[in-house]
Structures are given as structure tokens and as C-alpha cells.
């Protein structure tokens, strides 16, 4: 007998014994006898069943069910199924096995009514004994069975539907807790239930609705309206994570298969478009879409948005007034096309977008529109790419553009030849230039285009053909017209015709002396080198291909110049026009490979290799004073090169060494706060570091590096987060190893706590100033006692070498004080010491000078000391004012000595007129807008002729001076002035009274600061605590920097008229308290800028300190807010009240945009400002309405912005929540990671109700995803706090029912399966065991809590609740799962780092549970 038959027979026997169904005659057994026989039958069944393998058991049960399904009698079917249920109740058949076999039975079809009904009734009764994994499988089968019903259900099959509905309803029952509801929603979200019976559909819809509020707790209010500020900084992951999109769908990365709001599930086209529209956004776009340059990733979504940008530009051109003949780019639309050209070239060049697809899509759109005004601009954009790439690609790749000619140039008559004196002629001739390139490529490939040029362009074509003939362009030169540009653009791919116009263009800036070996310096004397560079208008009129040819020619010429053996190494006979033009070409990001990459990777190494120090000096000056928007990794790379360069013996020359250090100082102080960690950590943490960013010898540069690090940590909010700054330790160790030093207490107090702790760990012995004075006196006695020159040089020339103190400058100082002169032999000693070693002597001189003045009670002696130092600077040229003041500002001085140093700095700068005269002259005759000038060099020479600058005491002894093209003492002093002002701000007000005087006299120099608003922002942000009670000084700082530019910038370019009025009032007028309308105006101004309205005067963003209008708007707004005579709390509360109280004046469709803008502003302010939002949140959470909920609406309704706005409900809760979420969304990781601390300190002590807890869940829920990626520990901390708060709420109201325990538990399951796994199992289990039984039952799957254990830990607390749980629909006597078995708890990550996985992996994990 087969096992299948045996099992069926045994079931039949049990059935007979139980029902007394006998076929023989005889006395009827009594009830007890029947029961005994049934039990014996079950034991027999159990024995047989236990001996079977799992596969045999399944087959046997399957056969048994098939047998039962074949019975036509309803009662007999019921009795058979009752036997199987009883066998489950006795533990003979596992409940899961029976349910699985029932649900998978091929006979379980709704047409078999009896079998269907009885089966689902059995499942309904035994499912309580199935572990949650088995229940999940049963639910899946129920879903499939529900979908098997016809759309129209007759009364005959309604009972089957009702039985199925009961089982599904029981599975969905929250009190039954058969499996985590999180698994149910994950499963039902996968299918479409539109065609299912209304009972099932209603059941599912209601269950989904329960999870809508869970998704609400995980969603940022107005997320789809959030927009970032696009900066030209390097985009570290922690800055991009909030903005990442799927490159295929453009959708947000939302975790969990939850019913999020529809706008969150849609492609975020608005976000990508906004970013694409911003200049200098290409890196952010690549980071957002995870596009890698090294991989050829086609992004169709990006192609579509590039086409959209083109169409928008075409529409803008339709509205544009007729263009002027102005040579400069004057209209907003022209800037749009310029930016569009850059974007298109970049994304097509790296094959993220396909040129043919873009052109074809454009043709399709333009063919059905009547947009013609922008056609020339469009063809100009396409010409940029075509001219540079057509030689490397087949002609067939470009043929789609021919269709555009048909759509855009349908004229039957030729268009007139444009005026070639107008730069726009290059755009008007662009379609003809494209045609010429296509013909040339077709000719080289022997491809027949087989069509003539459009009639509209015939005259243009004839004009260019005539112009290119040798007899017509033989005398061409760069005049005021654009014929050369036209020829270059049209024939850049035709060497026969391109060489002559390009040669003429180069000759304009190079002069006739093309061969550096011919004549050397004598040629320069006989024939002056060109000084007028190519204007930006001319460069803009050239295609990218022509620009690349031009920059290649310039670099080649410079390298040949450097390699020329007849050129004196320290001289430089490069034409000023050439150098200035080269610097202007470097602003074009489209030619980056030949631009900044070529500068750092080719030109600088070749110049250095050739020891062409004059050219090297010029290039470093150019980088300091002419380069804009250079990506941070290039700047840090150059800094590393400069540190290597500084150690080379050949650069140990005063002027060159000064230039290297000055350039390095600018690079260090110019690093953006968000750039510091991203760039510096590469040089510290990577095993194969690309170089060294720490100076081996310059203490001043390393101090500046630490100050920049401090500022970065403060502004990015990482100064309190040790986890954010682990890499700093290695950097500081390297600095202290190379240049050991200490810091003044007033400076350390301004350092962020983490950096302060790291710095004070390095103990450096403090120098004895009294001993220093004795040593100087001793050296001076040695000097006066020695007469032999060789002995003097031998003794003092080794000063500063190991074992000998670097006191020679102190000696010279004392020599001048005593004798008013310097011995000629001192010059030889200075030359022997060298510029590099002299830095150590300068530090000793500063210490000695401060000690002398501090201990001098005689005012005449103080004046003598200052006069002596001035003589060393201006008369003897031993040291420079910038290096001395920098060194003096950075010395470690406390108390009276610090005050003395400030006094010395003031006297050095202002007592004599030497520096003041230079500054006044330079400021009065020059403009910082060098890109608009063609006579910079003339003014530069005039200044140096009036104020010649020497870098050595006697140039006949040393090397001859290097030619200076850009710099002077005033420009070199700017970064020093920045640092000096910061030192003043660190000390008490009584010690820094002289700062006002310095600002009065030196403030105009900020006219030439390359980042004036950024400097103000950094200063006011970093020193906010020091300046909080000094409103007059804040006003003075802002007024000085912004006022210095009043003659250069248009009105209202930065601060508002209200603030300008405040600045213009008397110094004591610091009691201005702006009203709410003022803050509304500030927010509206920035919001309008983000929306694309031209609020600020137009500017060339290529030369601006900010890359685009929204970035400019953000920083000028922050500067103004930081400069107000109002405390942080007042400003922050007013910004929050812009929405809370100003809600009626905000357009309803723009309210989320305004909240986004407020979040941007607040996140960019110091913690004392954005921290106020936690105070406002605390006020909301602790308000009486939160502790005693009297609203008719649920908390989820009042915390839903859309519902509140549409139903006009109480808005305070949700508005504060929306602003808080906006601030956190825009915050850096250093700021957002503080949320854990704020919850512990501000919220945890006051949360007693579930309404308060739900509000907190709305606050932190949306940011778990980001924290998991960047601070996984924070997710664990927040999770633990949420469980502790749940216990706190539970204990606070033990006799009250918790109305919203289900959504809270659902959120906790989301956290488990999406973030923490089993990592916190032991911590959480202890808390769960202390909760009320209803909560224990719901959370039992998190910690594998058995049903029979629920309520045990409650007995000592609440005897009445002990052992009680929610009503269960079936037997729950067995464990829901067994650890380590197939039906056990889902496999989850065991290590913290394993929880940081991508959403698809986590989704798959949930699906596999």
C-alpha cells in the first residue's frame, strides 16, 4: 500500500471512529470507547506520519486533499477537513504544512464550492499556528485566488468569495498579529486590484490607507518643491545624497514599498531642470544622476531635459527685444544660450547624451512650432559641438542637422550678410559655418550630401568663400570687426584655410616676435610686445574648436619660450597681451582639458623643468589674480605642487619664494568650507596620497591651513562631531611634526571643540622671551667684536641651521637701532641664508620686536623700533610688509603682548605713508573688473614705475628681479589683511580698538578682493559668538567691504536698501529692529531669484565670486542677516514667522517654495540661528493641545500640510514641522547629525503622549535614509530613543488605550527592515518586554518574542494586564518562529556597516522574508 493510500485510509478510519459510521452489525460502543478509538487512530496516524520524509508528507497530504476534493457530499467534506484540523490541533500535522498544501492544491478552485469553503474555514482556524513566513505565503496565495474570480460575481460563487475574504481579513487583523503588517503592505503594493471584487478591493484599500500615514511620517513636507543652491564646490556625497535621482526615471530614492504621495513617486523633472539651468552645475548634475566620466552612460532623461532647455531658450528669444550693437553680452537670453552651449558640449562629449537624438527631437518639436527668433543662437550652440567633434566622427552622425535647415530657414530669398562689426554676426553666420564643416567632412569621406545650401544662406556662404581666398585675407588683422572670428569658426576643420586667420589672431597678442630664439630680450627693446589682450567679446565669438586651437598655440609658445636656451632664466619676454588672453581663455569650462588641466599637467611642469623662473612667476601670479571658478581638486593639486616647489634650491630666491608662498596662502584661505574635507582628506587618508598639502617649512602656511580647517568645521557644522573629523588628526600630526607651534587662548576659544581638543594635545615648549633678548644681545656683541669679513659670514651665515638660533634679522634690527645703518657684509649673509630659511629669522624678529615694545616704557623707543622695522621694509628691502604682518598676526601672543602686536601692526601700516600711498594710488587708478579692460598693463606699469618694488637689499648681489605682470604689494597684502582682521576679532573689544582705524585706511583694498561677500560670510559666521554683542563692529565690517565696491558694482547688488540706510547712519545707531515685512522682503527677493526673476543686476558669472544668481542671493542674504543688530534668536524667529505669521501674504501655490528658501537661509547660518527651530519645535510639542488632544481631526491630519491648507485647519503644528524639515534637508551632515542630541535634551523629557511621539516621528522619519548613508550610528541612536519614548508614553498613560500604536509599530518595522536589521535586537527586546501586551504582541517579530511570553514582565507592574493580549482569531500556542529554522526570523545584517545597502537590496530582503 502506498503512503498516499495509507494516509487516506487512516483519515477515513479516524473519521469512522469519530462519527460512529460502521458497516457491521453489533452493539454500539459508548462515547468513551469512540473517543478512545479515535485517539488510537490519531496515534497510529502520528506514528505513520512521523516516519515519512518531508517530501512524502507533502505528497500524502496533497493526495488526501485531492481525495477530499472529489467527494460530492458537503458534510463528508466538512468531516474530512475537520479530521485534518484536529490533527493540526493535536500537533500531529504542522499547521503550516497543511495550509501550504491546501493553498497549493490544484483542486482549490472556486468552482468546487464545498471543498473551497471547507478548506478556507480550516485555514482560518489553524493559521494562528503558522509562523509569520508561512502566513505571508498564505497571503500571497489568497491574493492569487482573489484575482482568479471573474469580474462579475454571481450569487452562486459569492459564498466562496466571502470565505476567502474572511481569511484575508483575519490575516490583515492588527489584533491577530499573524505577521508584521509591513510585510502585508509590501506584498499588496505589488499588484493592481482594480478588477477584484469590491469586498477584497475595499479591504486592501483600507489597509493601504493605514500605511499612507506611515509614508507621511517618512516624507519631507513639500519634498517635490525643494531646490538646492548650485555651487561650484566639489560635491561630496553628503551634499548630494538629498538630491540624488534615478538616472533612468528621475525618481527619488524612497525606501520601502509604501504608498507615498503621488508627487514623490513622479519623475523629479523640476529639480533636474532647475539644476541644469544654473551655470557651473554640470558636476552636480553628474553627481545627482550618478554619471561617471569614465563610463559611457547614456541618460535619456538628461537628453530630454537638454532639449527642453533649448526650447525654453528659443521661447525666450521670441520675447527678446531686437539686439543691440553692443560688443558685450547684454541680454539675459544671450547668457542662457552661452550656458546652454557649455552644458550641451559637456554632456554630449562625455556621451551622457547623444547628439543625433537631441537634434532629431529638436527638429520634431520645432517643426510644429513657430519659433524662429532664436534659430541663429541654436545653430551657434550646435556649431560648438560640430566643429570640435566632426573630424573624429562619421558624417552620418551629423546628417540629422540638415532637417533643421528645412524647419528654421525656409526663406525663398537670401538673407543679407550680417554686419561683421557686430559680435552677433558670428551667431548669424553659424548655420553657414556648420554647412561648410559638413561639406568638408563629406568630401574627406567621399560622401555625397546631394543637396545645395538653403537659399536663405547663399549670400552668407558666398561672403565666407570670398573672405577666405588668400588674396583677400593676406592683410587680415584683428581690428574692431569679427571677420577673423568668422573665418576661424567656418574653417577650423580645414587646415588649408584655418592657419592664416588663426595666425593673424595669434599675432595680435604675440607680436611679430614668434620665435623666442630670435633676438631674445633685444627684440623686446626694439619692438614693444603687444599689451592689449583679445577682448571677451572676441573670445566669445570664437567656437570652442577655435578657442582650443588658440589656447594650444599659446601654451606651445610658452613652453618654447621656457625651453629657449637664449632666454635668460629670470627674464620673461612674453607679451602681456598673450598672458592676459591666456588667463581669459581659462574661464571657459568647455576647454578644460587644454585649459586648467593643461596648465597644471603640462605647462607648469615644463616651465619648472626648464628653470624658466620668470615664466613660472608670471603663471603663479596669473593663478592668484586672474583665475576664476577653478575646481577645488585642481587648486589643492597646485597647492601640493607649490609645497614641492618650495623645497627646490632654485626657488630659494626672495621674489620667487614670496610668490610661491603668497599663491599658496591664497589657495589655502580661498578653499570653500564644504571643499576642505572632501579635498584634504584625500591627501591624508588615502594610502597613495596624490601629494602633500602640508608645508614642510612654512609655519605661517600651516597655521593658515589650521585656521581654514577651523572655519570649515564651524560652517559645515562638523566641529562638534568627532566622527566627521577623524581625518583631521592625521593632518594635524603632520603639521605639528613639520612646524611645531602653539595657539593663543583667544584663538583656541574660537576653534570648534573637536579641533580644539586635537590641537591642545600637541604640547610645544613655550619660548623664553627674556632668553631671546639675551641671545640677540650676545650675537650683537659678537658682531661688533668681529672684524674679518669671512669670519663674520662664516659665523652669521649659518644662523638658523640646526644648533644655531635664527637671529640674524633680530641682529640687523638692533644694528639699525644702534647705528642707523647696515653693514654691506650683511647683504652677503642674507644671500647666504636664503629666502626660505629667512622665514624662521622673521618669526624670531616678530617675537623680539613684541618683547622690546612690551617692555619699553619709553614712547620714543617704541617709535624708534617701528621706524627701524619700516626701514627694513621700505629702505633696505630686507623683508616685505605682507610677510612681516602675516607673521606678526599669527604669532602665539597672550594678553598684553597680543595688544602690543596689534599696536605694532597699526604703526607699521599707518605711521609712515609708504604703504598708504601705494594703496591709495592703486585703488584710485585700477578696477577689479580686469576682464573688461584692455589697458590693465599700462596702469600696472605706471604703478610700478611710481612705486618700484625690490625684493632684495641689493639686486646686484642677488639675481635680477623677475618681471611682474599682475601683482603688487597691495594685492599680496589682501589675504594677509583677511587674517589680520580675524585676529582682531578674537580678542576682547578693549584690545582691538585699532581695528576701526585699520578698516578706515585699508578697507578700500577690498575693492580687489576676489571673494568679498564670501569673506564677509565666513567672518560673520565663524566669529558669530564674538560679534554677537558688537553690532557696531558688524556694521563696520559689512559697510567697509561692500562700500569698497560702490564705484564698481551697481546699486542694490548685495544688501537691501533698508540695510544700506542702516549702514549710512551714525555709528551709535545700532538699535534698529526690523519688522516682519523686512524679513518677508528678504525671503521674497531670494525666492524670486530662485524662480529665475532677474532681481540682482546682470553680471558676467564667469568672473563673479558666485557661479549663479541663487548662490549670490543666498550669501548676500546671509551676510545681511548676520550683520543685523539683532540677536540670533530674534533673526531666526522672524524668519520662521515669515511663514507662520506671514502665511496670508504668501501665494498659496508658492508656500512650499518659500519654506524651501527659508530652509536654505537658516541652514547656511550658524547653529545659534538654525538651532532656534528646535526651540520652536519644543514649544509645539509641549503645548497643552499636544498633551490633551481635543481636536476633532487625528494628529496625522493636522500634521499633513495638504489637508491643513485645503481644510483651513490649525496650521502651527505643520508649518513649524515643514520649516524644520526644510532646514534639515538643506543641512550638511554635521548639522543634521545633531538631531539625536536635540531629541535627547529637548524632546525626550517632555514627551508623554502618543501625539507628541507621532510629531517627533514626523520630524526624524524623513531623514533616516540620509543618516543611514552618512551616519549609521545616528540611526541606531534614534531608533533606541524612539523605543524608549514609546515605553515612556506607555507608562505615562497605563490605563488609557493607545489609539495610534499600529502606525508607530509600522514605522518601527520599517526602521528594522530598511536600516538596522538585527543589530539592536538585545537592546530593543528588553524595552519591548516592558511594554503593555498589545504593544508586545505587535512588536514580537522584531525580537522573536514568543506569544506565551507576552505580558510576563508586566505582572509586577499591572497584574490585571498580565498575560492578556489582543484577541486572536485562532490557536497561538506555539512560537511564531524558531531561530535558525526555515520558518524563523528573517535573515538580517549582523554588522553595522552591512545595514548601509541600497534600496533595491533592502526591497529584495523584505520580499524574501
Swiss-Prot record:
Any one of the GO BP annotations: regulation of transcription by RNA polymerase II
InterPro entries xref list: Mediator_Med23
Pfam families: Med23
Keywords for the protein's UniProt record, in alphabetical order: Activator, Nucleus, Transcription, Transcription regulation
Annotated GO CC locations: mediator complex; transcription regulator complex
Primary subcellular site in the record, as a coarse category: nucleus
Positions of region (Disordered): 1359-1409
Family under the similarity heading: Belongs to the Mediator complex subunit 23 family.
Function: Component of the Mediator complex, a coactivator involved in the regulated transcription of nearly all RNA polymerase II-dependent genes. Mediator functions as a bridge to convey information from gene-specific regulatory proteins to the basal RNA polymerase II transcription machinery. Mediator is recruited to promoters by direct interactions with regulatory proteins and serves as a scaffold for the assembly of a functional preinitiation complex with RNA polymerase II and the general transcription factors.
Protein name: Mediator of RNA polymerase II transcription subunit 23
Organism in which the protein naturally occurs: Aedes aegypti
Gene designation per UniProt: MED23
Amino acid at each position: 500500500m502506498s503512503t498516499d493510500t495509507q494516509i487516506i485510509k487512516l483519515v477515513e478510519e479516524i473519521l469512522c471512529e469519530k462519527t460512529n459510521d460502521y458497516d457491521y452489525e453489533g452493539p454500539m460502543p459508548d462515547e468513551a470507547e469512540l473517543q478512545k478509538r479515535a485517539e488510537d487512530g490519531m496515534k497510529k496516524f502520528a506514528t505513520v506520519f512521523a516516519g515519512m520524509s518531508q517530501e512524502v508528507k507533502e505528497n500524502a497530504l496533497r493526495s488526501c486533499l485531492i481525495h477530499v476534493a472529489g467527494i460530492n457530499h458537503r458534510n463528508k467534506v466538512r468531516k474530512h477537513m475537520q479530521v485534518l484540523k484536529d490533527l493540526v490541533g493535536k500537533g500531529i500535522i504542522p499547521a503550516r504544512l497543511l495550509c501550504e498544501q491546501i493553498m497549493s492544491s490544484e483542486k482549490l478552485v472556486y468552482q468546487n464550492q464545498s471543498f473551497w469553503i471547507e478548506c478556507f474555514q480550516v485555514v482560518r482556524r489553524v493559521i494562528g499556528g503558522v509562523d509569520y513566513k508561512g502566513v505571508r505565503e498564505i497571503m500571497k496565495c489568497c491574493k492569487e485566488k482573489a484575482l482568479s474570480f471573474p469580474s462579475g460575481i454571481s450569487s452562486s460563487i459569492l459564498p466562496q468569495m466571502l470565505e476567502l475574504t474572511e481569511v484575508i481579513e483575519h490575516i490583515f487583523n492588527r489584533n491577530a498579529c499573524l505577521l508584521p503588517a509591513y510585510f502585508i503592505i509590501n506584498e499588496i503594493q505589488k499588484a493592481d486590484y482594480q478588477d477584484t471584487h469590491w469586498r477584497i478591493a475595499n479591504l486592501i484599500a483600507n489597509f493601504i490607507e493605514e500605511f499612507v500615514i506611515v509614508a507621511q511620517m517618512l516624507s519631507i513636507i513639500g519634498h517635490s518643491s525643494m531646490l538646492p543652491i548650485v555651487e561650484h564646490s566639489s560635491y561630496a556625497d553628503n551634499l548630494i545624497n538629498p538630491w540624488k535621482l534615478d538616472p533612468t526615471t528621475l525618481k527619488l530614492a524612497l525606501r520601502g514599498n509604501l504608498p507615498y504621495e503621488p508627487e514623490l513617486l513622479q519623475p523629479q523633472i523640476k529639480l533636474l531642470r532647475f539644476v541644469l539651468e544654473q551655470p557651473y552645475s554640470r558636476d552636480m548634475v553628474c553627481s545627482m544622476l550618478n554619471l561617471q566620466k569614465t563610463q559611457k552612460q547614456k541618460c535619456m532623461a538628461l537628453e530630454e531635459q537638454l532639449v527642453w532647455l533649448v526650447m525654453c531658450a528659443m521661447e525666450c528669444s521670441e520675447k527678446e527685444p531686437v539686439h543691440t550693437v553692443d560688443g558685450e553680452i547684454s541680454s539675459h537670453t544671450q547668457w542662457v544660450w552661452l550656458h546652454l552651449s557649455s552644458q550641451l558640449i559637456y554632456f554630449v562629449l562625455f556621451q551622457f547624451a547623444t547628439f543625433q537624438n537631441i537634434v532629431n527631437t529638436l527638429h520634431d518639436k520645432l517643426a510644429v512650432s513657430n519659433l524662429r527668433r532664436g534659430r541663429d543662437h541654436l545653430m551657434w550652440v550646435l556649431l560648438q559641438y560640430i566643429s570640435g567633434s566632426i573630424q573624429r566622427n562619421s558624417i552620418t552622425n551629423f546628417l540629422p542637422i540638415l532637417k533643421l535647415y528645412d524647419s528654421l530657414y525656409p526663406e525663398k530669398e537670401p538673407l543679407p550678410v550680417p554686419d561683421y562689426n557686430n559680435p552677433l554676426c558670428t551667431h548669424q553666420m553659424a548655420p553657414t559655418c556648420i554647412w561648410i564643416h559638413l561639406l568638408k567632412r563629406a568630401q574627406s569621406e567621399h560622401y555625397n550630401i546631394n543637396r545645395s545650401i538653403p537659399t536663405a544662406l547663399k549670400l552668407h556662404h558666398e561672403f565666407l568663400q570670398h573672405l577666405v581666398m588668400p588674396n583677400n585675407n593676406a592683410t587680415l588683422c584683428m581690428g574692431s570687426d569679427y571677420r577673423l572670428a568668422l573665418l576661424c569658426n567656418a574653417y577650423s576643420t580645414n587646415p588649408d584655410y584655418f592657419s592664416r586667420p588663426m595666425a593673424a589672431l595669434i599675432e595680435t597678442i604675440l607680436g611679430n616676435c614668434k620665435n623666442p630664439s630670435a633676438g631674445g630680450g633685444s627684440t623686446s627693446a626694439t619692438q614693444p610686445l603687444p599689451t592689449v589682450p583679445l577682448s571677451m567679446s572676441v573670445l566669445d565669438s570664437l567656437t570652442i574648436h577655435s578657442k582650443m586651437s588658440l589656447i594650444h598655440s599659446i601654451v606651445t609658445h610658452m613652453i618654447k619660450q621656457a625651453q629657449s636656451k637664449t632666454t635668460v632664466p629670470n627674464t620673461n619676454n612674453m607679451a602681456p597681451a598673450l598672458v592676459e588672453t591666456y588667463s581669459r581663455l581659462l574661464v571657459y569650462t568647455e576647454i578644460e582639458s587644454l585649459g586648467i588641466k593643461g596648465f597644471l599637467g603640462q605647462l607648469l611642469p615644463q616651465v619648472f623643468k626648464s628653470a624658466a623662473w620668470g615664466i613660472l612667476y608670471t603663471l603663479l601670479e596669473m593663478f592668484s589674480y586672474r583665475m576664476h571658478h577653478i575646481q577645488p581638486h585642481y587648486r589643492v593639486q597646485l597647492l601640493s605642487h607649490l609645497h614641492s616647489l618650495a623645497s627646490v634650491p632654485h626657488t630659494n630666491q626672495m621674489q620667487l619664494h614670496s610668490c610661491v608662498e603668497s599663491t599658496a596662502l591664497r589657495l589655502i584661505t580661498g578653499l570653500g568650507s564644504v571643499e576642505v574635507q572632501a579635498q584634504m582628506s584625500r591627501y591624508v587618508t588615502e594610502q597613495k596620497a596624490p601629494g602633500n598639502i602640508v608645508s614642510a617649512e612654512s609655519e605661517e602656511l600651516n597655521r593658515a591651513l589650521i585656521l581654514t580647517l577651523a572655519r570649515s568645521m564651524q560652517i559645515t557644522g562638523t566641529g562638534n562631531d568627532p566622527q566627521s573629523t577623524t581625518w583631521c588628526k592625521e593632518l594635524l600630526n603632520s603639521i605639528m611634526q613639520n612646524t611645531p607651534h602653539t595657539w593663543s587662548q583667544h584663538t583656541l576659544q574660537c576653534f570648534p571643540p573637536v579641533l580644539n581638543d586635537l590641537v591642545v594635545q600637541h604640547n610645544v615648549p613655550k619660548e623664553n622671551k627674556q632668553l631671546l633678548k639675551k641671545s640677540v644681545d650676545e650675537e650683537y656683541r659678537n658682531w661688533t667684536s668681529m672684524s674679518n669679513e669671512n669670519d663674520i659670514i662664516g659665523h652669521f651665515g649659518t644662523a638658523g641651521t640646526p644648533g644655531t638660533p635664527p637671529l640674524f634679522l633680530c641682529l640687523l634690527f638692533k644694528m639699525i637701532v644702534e647705528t642707523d645703518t647696515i653693514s654691506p657684509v650683511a647683504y652677503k649673509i642674507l644671500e647666504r641664508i636664503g629666502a626660505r630659511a629667512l622665514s624662521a629669522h622673521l618669526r624670531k624678529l616678530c617675537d623680539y620686536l613684541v618683547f622690546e615694545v612690551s617692555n619699553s616704557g619709553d614712547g620714543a623707543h617704541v617709535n624708534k623700533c617701528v621706524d627701524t622695522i619700516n626701514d627694513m621694509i621700505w629702505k633696505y628691502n630686507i623683508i616685505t610688509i605682507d610677510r612681516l604682518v602675516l607673521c606678526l598676526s599669527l604669532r602665539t601672543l597672550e594678553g598684553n603682548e597680543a595688544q602690543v602686536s596689534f599696536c605694532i601692526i597699526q604703526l607699521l601700516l599707518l605711521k609712515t605713508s609708504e604703504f598708504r600711498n601705494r594703496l591709495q594710488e592703486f585703488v584710485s587708478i585700477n578696477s577689479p573688473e580686469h576682464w573688461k579692460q584692455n589697458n590693465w598693463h599700462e596702469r600696472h606699469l605706471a604703478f610700478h614705475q611710481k612705486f618700484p618694488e625690490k625684493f632684495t637689499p641689493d639686486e646686484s648681489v642677488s639675481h635680477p628681479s623677475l618681471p611682474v605682470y599682475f601683482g603688487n604689494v597691495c594685492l599680496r597684502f589682501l589675504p594677509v589683511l583677511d587674517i589680520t582682521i580675524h585676529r582682531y576679532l578674537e580678542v576682547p573689544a578693549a584690545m582691538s580698538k585699532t581695528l576701526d582705524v585699520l578698516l578706515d585706511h585699508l578697507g578700500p583694498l577690498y575693492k580687489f578682493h576676489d571673494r568679498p561677500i564670501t569673506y564677509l560670510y565666513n567672518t560673520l559666521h565663524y566669529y558669530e559668538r564674538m560679534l554677537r554683542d558688537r553690532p557696531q563692529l558688524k556694521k563696520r565690517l559689512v559697510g567697509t567691504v561692500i562700500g569698497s565696491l560702490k564705484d564698481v558694482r551697481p546699486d542694490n547688488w548685495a544688501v537691501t536698501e533698508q540695510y544700506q540706510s542702516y549702514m549710512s547712519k551714525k555709528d551709535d545707531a545700532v538699535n534698529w529692529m526690523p519688522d516682519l515685512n523686512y524679513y518677508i522682503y528678504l525671503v521674497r527677493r531670494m525666492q524670486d531669484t530662485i524662480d529665475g526673476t532677474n532681481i540682482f543686476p546682470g553680471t558676467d558669472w564667469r568672473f563673479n565670486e558666485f557661479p549663479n544668481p541663487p548662490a549670490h542671493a543666498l550669501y548676500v542674504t546671509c551676510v545681511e542677516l548676520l550683520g543685523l543688530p539683532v540677536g540670533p534668536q530674534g533673526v531666526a524667529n522672524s524668519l520662521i514667522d515669515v511663514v507662520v505669521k506671514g502665511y496670508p501674504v504668501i501665494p498659496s501655490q508658492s508656500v512650499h517654495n518659500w519654506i524651501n528658501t527659508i530652509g536654505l537661509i537658516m541652514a547656511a547660518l550658524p547653529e545659534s540661528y538654525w538651532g532656534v527651530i528646535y526651540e520652536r519645535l519644543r514649544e509645539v510639542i509641549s503645548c497643552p493641545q499636544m498633551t490633551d488632544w481635543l481636536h476633532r481631526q487625528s494628529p496625522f491630519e493636522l500634521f499633513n500640510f495638504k489637508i491643513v491648507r485645503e481644510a483651513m485647519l490649525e496650521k502651527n503644528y505643520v508649518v513649524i514641522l515643514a520649516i524644520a524639515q526644510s532646514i534639515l534637508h538643506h543641512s550638511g551632515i554635521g548639522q543634521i547629525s545633531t538631531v539625536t542630541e536635540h531629541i535627547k535634551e529637548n524632546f525626550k523629557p517632555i514627551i508623554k503622549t502618543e501625539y507628541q511621539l507621532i510629531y517627533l516621528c514626523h520630524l526624524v522619519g524623513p531623514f533616516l535614509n540620509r543618516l543611514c548613508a552618512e551616519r549609521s550610528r545616528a540611526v541606531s541612536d534614534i531608533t533606541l530613543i524612539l523605543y524608549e519614548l514609546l515605553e515612556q508614553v506607555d507608562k505615562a498613560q497605563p490605563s488609557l488605550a493607545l489609539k495610534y500604536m499600529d502606525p508607530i509599530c509600522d514605522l518601527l518595522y520599517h526602521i528594522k527592515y530598511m536600516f538596522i536589521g538585527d543589530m539592536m535586537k538585545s537592546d530593543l527586546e528588553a524595552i519591548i518586554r516592558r511594554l503593555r501586551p498589545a504593544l508586545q504582541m505587535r512588536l514580537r517579530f522584531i525580537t522573536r518574542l514568543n506569544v506565551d511570553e507576552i505580558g510576563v514582565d508586566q505582572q509586577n507592574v499591572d497584574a490585571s494586564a498580565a498575560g492578556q493580549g489582543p484577541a486572536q482569531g485562532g490557536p497561538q500556542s506555539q512560537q511564531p518562529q524558531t531561530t535558525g529554522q526555515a520558518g524563523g526570523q528573517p535573515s538580517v545584517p549582523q554588522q553595522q556597516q552591512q545595514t548601509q545597502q541600497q534600496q533595491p537590496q533592502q526591497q529584495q530582503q523584505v520580499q524574501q522574508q
